[in-house]
UniProtKB/Swiss-Prot annotation:
Keywords: Cell membrane, Membrane. Its main location: membrane. This is UDP-N-acetylglucosamine--peptide N-acetylglucosaminyltransferase stabilizing protein GtfB. The keyword Membrane applies. It is a peripheral membrane protein. Belongs to the GtfB family. One of its GO terms (cellular component) is protein N-acetylglucosaminyltransferase complex. GO terms for biological process: protein O-linked glycosylation via serine; regulation of protein stability. InterPro entries: GtfB. It is found in: Cell membrane. Required for polymorphic O-glycosylation of the serine-rich repeat protein (SRRP) in this bacteria. A stabilizing protein that is part of the accessory SecA2/SecY2 system specifically required to export serine-rich repeat cell wall proteins encoded in the same operon. The GtfA-GtfB complex adds GlcNAc from UDP-GlcNAc to the substrate protein, attaching the first sugar residue. Stabilizes the glycosylation activity of GtfA. Has no N-acetylglucosaminyl transferase activity on its own. Pathway: Protein modification; protein glycosylation. Forms a heterotetramer with 2 subunits each of GtfA and GtfB. Part of the accessory SecA2/SecY2 protein translocation apparatus.
Length: 441
């Protein structure tokens, strides 16, 4: 049995963490390694790169640069300058001010990307991508001794593996098949979670397996994806399709009947270290001063303390809110302070425009905070129930809703329970029962 993911995105993280929480241990392989996979997750690049796992990520000011070149950096990204000419952009693994280098995008004299140096969680420059006509054309992967072990023609799609005399593979799928066979994984039952590369690998393995698609993407209406219909219309290794979104499953699950695959539902196990304590403390995490109807909410809710934090400096517009007694501002907030704020607040206001920072909404959800927002500002709508979504012109209604929840414990419990249900939350027992049934086939 094997987890096979195209990428280690949020859905893959949730699925793997749910398995671990339920004490289910299945080997996990990620096809596209971005360099920052968890130590327990495998990939072809990690296997042939053989990196020293005791090393740390590269900190931005440890980049090797020509003399007199300099780095200008914020919490979110960096730039390399030769006097006043920008030579490269630095992409960090996260925007939490840790400044761990993931990519350095080197620019030509026209300011376009010439090549990219890719760094991994162990501080190695493990890959380089070269551009031609402003498009990625060729990628080289390096092992721990800085030797090229794999080259990828990004235009033609084929690979050259310099291992054991050398191999040529016409596609990524053939390379992955070779890797899986080389690693001697048990391929009798594969769990995959996309209808792209994971499915392609499954379709190209011996037909005597029994695979399961865990489908986490939202459906567009009641229309199923074309590749899912293919699995329903043909006999393949895929015998099960498990929906992971509660709302989609509730809407169409009863109508899914098929001779080639069976259907089921299994959502996500989320950690909840605490319950909502109905404290009148509201949190906003933002790097933007575009916070919708903030003044109205502050004035309507004088008994609620508004904590507004940013990992950057704050604009004069935002700093002006210091005039209100029920507002506390935290510019250049530290990670420790963010953790404390998340623990101390019971309301999260998802009302800022621009990008979300620090996975704020997910963090609020896992802390059982009541998440409230405007329909135009929601960053993670799957964690916000319809009762907690408002039109931009409904700030008064939002204010009354927040106060009612704080004053009525039964209402708060109902809102939090619905918030968790609509986020597709399930129990450890649900996971053990479903995965156990699949393992016993």
């Amino acid at each position: 049995m094997l987890n096979l993911f195209d990428n280690f995105d949020q859905a893959s993280f949730d699925f793997l963490r749910s398995q671990r929480t339920a004490q289910i241990k299945i080997p996990t392989v990620v096809i596209n390694d971005d360099g920052f996979l968890p130590p327990e997750v495998e990939s072809p690049i990690k296997y042939w790169g053989n990196y020293n796992v005791n090393k740390k990520p590269l900190y931005f000011d440890h980049l090797s640069l020509p003399r007199y070149w300099r780095i200008l950096s914020t919490a979110a990204q960096g730039h390399i300058y030769d006097l006043d000419k920008k030579r490269a952009d630095i992409i960090y693994q996260a925007t939490d001010n840790t400044r761990q280098v993931k990519e350095v995008r080197w620019l030509n004299n026209n300011g376009k990307v010439s090549w990219i140096d890719h760094y991994n969680r162990y501080g190695y420059r493990f890959a380089q991508t070269y551009y031609r006509n402003e498009q990625p054309a060729w990628r080289k992967y390096y092992d721990k001794k800085n030797r090229v072990f794999l080259e990828w023609n990004l235009i033609a799609g084929d690979f050259f593996l310099d291992v054991d005399g050398g191999y040529h593979f016409p596609s990524l799928i053939e390379l992955v098949k070779y890797y899986l066979q080389t690693r001697h994984f048990k391929l009798d039952h594969i769990f995959y979670n996309t209808l792209n590369q994971g499915l392609s690998v499954s379709l190209n393995l011996p037909a005597d397996g029994s695979d399961t698609l865990f489908w986490h993407e939202p459906l567009s209406g009641d229309e199923l994806p074309g590749n899912m219909k293919f699995l329903m219309e043909n006999s393949t290794r895929t015998k099960h399709i498990i929906f992971q979104r509660y709302t989609d499953w509730q809407r169409i699950g009863a109508n899914l009947k098929n001779n080639h695959v069976d259907f089921g539902f299994l959502g996500t196990i989320y950690p909840h270290p605490r319950a909502n304590q109905l404290r009148p403390q509201a949190l906003i995490l933002t790097n933007s001063d575009e916070i919708v109807e903030l003044s109205t909410l502050i004035k309507n809710l004088p008994n609620i303390k508004f904590h507004i934090a940013a990992v950057t400096e704050m604009s004069g517009k935002l700093l002006a809110y210091q005039q209100y007694e029920n507002v506390e501002l935290y510019p250049n907030v530290s990670s420790a302070r963010v953790k404390q704020l998340i623990a101390d607040c019971d309301i999260y206001l998802d009302i800022n425009r621009q990008n979300e920072i620090l996975d704020a909404v997910r963090g609020a959800f896992e802390q059982n905070m009541l998440i409230v927002g405007f329909d135009e500002t929601l960053h993670e709508p799957q964690f916000v129930t319809p009762q907690n979504m408002f039109k931009v012109n409904e700030a008064q209604k939002m204010s009354k809703h927040i106060m009612a929840a704080l004053l009525k414990p039964a209402l708060m419990k109902e809102l939090i329970d619905t918030q968790r249900q609509l986020a597709s939350e399930v129990s450890v027992q649900d996971y053990q029962r479903m995965i156990g049934a699949l393992q016993s086939e």
